[in-house]
Amino acid sequence: YPTVILSAEDSTSFPGVTKPVSEGGLGFDYKWDMGWMNDTLNYFRTEPKYRSENYHKLTFSMMYYYDDRFLLPLSHDEVVHGKATILQKMSGQYEEKFPQARALYMYMYAHPGKKLNFMGNEIGQFREWDEKREQDWNLLEFPLHQCFLRFMEELNGIYGSHPAFYEKDYDREGFEWIDCHQEEKCIYAFERISRKERVAAVFNFSDREQEYLLKIQDAKELEPLLSSEWKEFGGKETRSSKRLTGSRGEFIVSLPAYSGGDYLV
């Protein structure tokens, strides 16, 4: 069955879940990265003032990522039995949850590994999943939920049209940290790399706007691909395709609170 995908929901450290059976492995195509899921959701539950001390919850996954073929899961398990939906897990009040959820999904899609996103997450569901009921489609009558769905649609489109996000998911050459030591600022930056393109992903998970000096070797210009803070997604920024011009690979970027941005290098 060449078109069937076998994924293992496994929280153990057993080596070789995705190695071929002929090599002593279990033969799965992918293994759910439960560590990434737990660390990421715990981070976004945390109040912004405490995120600095939890900064490396979002860097730890790359310490072990290449040990198996990991898949990043935001599955049905995370939106049932009193755990709250993905949107509800975000810190803060109603209006604060949406920009954080958008930034979370930008981080997820830029991070190496295939993605699993459970139905209802894309509309900002507030009610936990119930197999006896359909999704709460009436949420799409509300502007923030409309904008969130629009964001998820565009995020999927950007992901699918830029091989840097997926071509070398399981190749060490496909990912490189730009900056993972901004504990006080809660800023992260890394590159995704394919044979023909490079994309820089930059995140500000603090509750304040910040200017940041982004350093990318050999880069002269950056072309904006996507910002989680564009107005059509519920943010405050006007969409712009204007390229950023740097000097000696250094770019000054303005990072809104709770935001992510992708740039074609």
Report each predicted region and the residues it spans:
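Alpha-amylase-like alpha-glycosidases and glucanotransferases acting on alpha-linked glucans and related
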Residues: 1-115, 123, 130, 167-171, ...
